[in-house]
Amino acid sequence: MISKQDFPTINDRVPAGQKPNGAPYRVLVVDDSMFVSKQIGQILTSEGYEVADTAVDGVDGVEKYKAMSPGVDLVTMDITMPKMDGITALEKILEFDKNAKVVIISALGKEELVKKALLLGAKNYIVKPLDRKKVLERIASVLK
């Protein structure tokens, strides 16, 4: 006879946000919208990721990445921000750490900027409005 023990529970599944050693992947969220930063944070923490910090513009993001490196596994980077845009911040992070994993966050209609970011070295992109499944899939694919 089949019992409950024959079916793994959702609690037995290893969250996507955990490294093989059980530690969480650490993410720096760079976005000038507090709403978007909070939304990304909620999506990521629900899967076991740790939001290591947030930054409100490219300047802040680059400074925090440098200060926390190598303790950041991935950066989510908005393209359009004050002080320093996401493309420039991406370039500065990659100058500092050529192996940095940066995922660009973009509004619809910014395809040319997304292409530019990918050519410069961004590992993937996510389009706003955020879709939980796509956010998790794209981030997980970069961290594999």
Curated annotation (Swiss-Prot):
Described purpose of this protein according to its UniProt entry: Involved in the transmission of sensory signals from the chemoreceptors to the flagellar motors. CheY seems to regulate the clockwise (CW) rotation.
Lineage of the species this protein comes from: Bacteria, Pseudomonadati, Spirochaetota, Spirochaetia, Spirochaetales
Source species of the chain: Treponema pallidum (strain Nichols)
Transmembrane segments: none
PTM description: Phosphorylated by CheA.
Gene Ontology cellular-component annotations: cytoplasm
Protein name (record): Chemotaxis protein CheY
Compartments, record wording: Cytoplasm
Residues binding Mg(2+): 31-32, 78, 80
Domain annotation Response regulatory: ranges: 26-143
Gene Ontology annotations of biological process type: archaeal or bacterial-type flagellum-dependent cell motility; chemotaxis; phosphorelay signal transduction system
Co-factor remark: Binds 1 Mg(2+) ion per subunit.
Keyword Metal-binding: yes
One MF annotation (Gene Ontology) recorded for this entry: metal ion binding
UniProt KW keywords: Chemotaxis, Cytoplasm, Flagellar rotation, Magnesium, Metal-binding, Phosphoprotein, Two-component regulatory system
Cofactor: Mg(2+)
Post-translational modification 4-aspartylphosphate, affected residues: 78
